[in-house]
Amino acid sequence: MTAVFDRRVPGIRSSDFQPPFQSAAAMHHPSQESPTLPESSATDSDYYSPTGAAPHGYCSPTSASYGKALNPYQYQYGMNGSAGTYPAKAYADYGYGSPYHQYGGAYGRGQSSAGQPEKEVAEPEVRMVNGKPKKVRKPRTIYSSFQLAALQRRFQKTQYLALPERAELAASLGLTQTQVKIWFQNKRSKIKKIMKNGEMPPEHSPSSSDPMACNSPQSPAVWEPQGSSRSLGHHGHGHPPAANPSPGSYLESPSAWYPAASPLGSHLQPHGSLQHPLALPSGTIY
């Protein structure tokens, strides 16, 4: 057993196998320093012979492609190391990832700065409260008395504004078009709700500046005495006995009951009674 092993060991450790192994070791050291080619590249695939491989997986000592694949890389490394124009250790000294991280950091900062306005716009709308998204309402617009009066006057004219009218009204009042539009929408919905309940909106009620509107509720009280006196006069002229004299006048003046018994011009009594029906009970002519 020992004799056979001693005989086979010199065959494995031959002089032909030693130089490629050293060159392979020399190649692996610069590949770790150089960032251009990783360790497992296309040149590493030439380490193994496609046809004749050793039982333990070592590469063939007489592989022609192995030497040819190493020569360009060795020459390139030699030129880079000697010339100094593009030194292979430059990336290793400064760090291969440093330029990438610098540019990456600048790009990341540019993205974050560009995304900041979007976050600022989105923050007032949604906010996390107790782990739940909650909409944050914008503060209500406080209108001045002048603005409210102008909006009310325009709303009485028309409940819907065109775009030019809305822009003109907003510019004259110092408001935005959105504020004017929302005010008109709220006013329309409020009036619809009031009319649905059967009530009259305050702006459509009779105004105090209209004299006819002020006098219209009092007109029955003003005309009632005149109507009552007219009705009394009508009944008095048409029906003389309908007058209401005092009870003593009936006892003192029997001529009211018997007009023909009067000694003076009885033919004038009916005419006089028709003209003055209320004067007969007060006194009689004898």
Curated annotation (Swiss-Prot):
Disulfide bonds: none
Gene Ontology MF terms in the entry: DNA-binding transcription activator activity, RNA polymerase II-specific; DNA-binding transcription factor activity, RNA polymerase II-specific; HMG box domain binding; RNA polymerase II cis-regulatory region sequence-specific DNA binding
Residues in coiled coil: none
DNA-binding region per Swiss-Prot/TrEMBL record: 136-195
InterPro entries named among the record's database cross-references: Distal-less_Homeobox_TF, Distal-less_N, HD, HD_metazoa, Homeobox_CS, Homeodomain-like_sf, HTH_motif
Low complexity composition bias: residue spans: 239-249
Swiss-Prot/TrEMBL keywords: Developmental protein, DNA-binding, Homeobox, Nucleus, Osteogenesis, Transcription, Transcription regulation
Biased segments, Polar residues type: 32-48, 205-219
Gene Ontology cellular-component annotations: chromatin; cytoplasm; nucleoplasm
GO biological process, one term: positive regulation of canonical Wnt signaling pathway
Family matches, as PROSITE patterns: HOMEOBOX_1, HOMEOBOX_2
Compartments reported by the entry: Nucleus
Known role: Transcriptional factor involved in bone development. Could be involved in apical ectodermal ridge activity, pattern formation, and cartilage differentiation. Binds to DNA.
Family from the record: Belongs to the distal-less homeobox family.
The protein, known as: Homeobox protein DLX-5
Organism: Gallus gallus
